[in-house]
Amino acid sequence: MKKLILMSITSALAMLVSAGTLDREPGIKILNERMTLLPYVALSYTYDTNVDCTKAAKSGSQWVINPGMELKYEDDNWLVDAVAWYKYHAYNNYSSQLNSSSFGERLKWQWTNASNGGRGWTILFSEQFEQIAQDDNLSSLGGRGMNRDRKQFQAEGVISRRINQWWHGALRSDYYLLDYDNNVSEYAWLYGWSRLQLGLEGGCTLSRWTDLIISANYQWYWHDDDFDNHQDMEDIYGSRRGRYVRGDSKGWSVMGGIATHMTEKLSYRLLAGWSHFEYGGGVSNLDGWTYQGSADWQIDAANTFHVMAIASSYYQPSEREFGSALLVHNASFGIAKSFVKNKLKAAADVAFRRETHEYTEYEADNYNENIWTARLTLSYRINRLLTVYGRVEYQTEESDGYYVRGNIYDYDRWRATIGLRMTW
């Protein structure tokens, strides 16, 4: 029932750790080699010291079979990247409460008539769906959501325009949905939520490497309250505030900063500003500084050494308490390196997530959770088809506050995985 952390950096590192190029690129090429199909299947074994992420620390292990298909298409103006996958989890023990299946898909579509950063339009659409098993790894949709069987969906559309060599702008919209598969006979209820966001960004190019950026976003949130006794009513009565507490929330943020390409290999983006979150149907408000930052450094000319860092803060509805809020701070750092003509690849990342729980009805119950995660992954490309890989993960949580007296949410968790992947 605990949170798995991860961050956007995981996806990038996973790509670096995946099978590399040996004699020739894997995949089935069609349409004059503009489209590549990459069918694959992977078999892995995982030992987990703490399946539930609790102080009780019950261990378990499982075999996972993971077939999937990747599709890539690219020409002068178009880019399509799609993945569909399925996982069957065969638990050796501790299986009565765990989902045996997980599956998902991801699609990215992009069109542009701007070349080399010149004047023109770019249209981007992406979406992703995942039905996630409780013991999922740390890469699922940025690690959002507690360690429980759940569905996640997100979609984003962006239209950007570079007007001339100095000015550019973008309009974006995105939707996110988190839906828990609650089973009250086994676990306490968790509250899913959804968000619709609209954003506008403008920039001015000061030099070849530096842009000034200003962005504004507005969000609408909806809390899932199916479990409560008031499930047929719109509102519940807030005992502390003497007002109705509802599941709808809204917020906005305004940020400014710089986006810089120091070289073709080194770039970063730093934004900071102010955010407002009105939750519980307007019963409570939160205001504070907010930030977003990312950095990417391709160190060597051969593209074998990669460093990334990401940090952000944001508000969201609580997943433990209806009509309450959560302030999240995320930070992560990762490196990836290739050896032996790209046959051997190594990646390491560390992440920190701080969650401040703000309760609507009883402020004395507010508490904090600090979650650290570290991971090391190695992969070796045996030949064009086969890759063997191994991964070690460690996660720990510390909590403080009146609600968690006795540190009831604290835990430590180790996971070790070894697997074999075949890509045609």
Please provide the spans of the model-predicted regions.
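Cleavable N-terminal export/targeting peptides
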Residues: 1-29
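Gram-negative and organellar
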Residues: 19-424
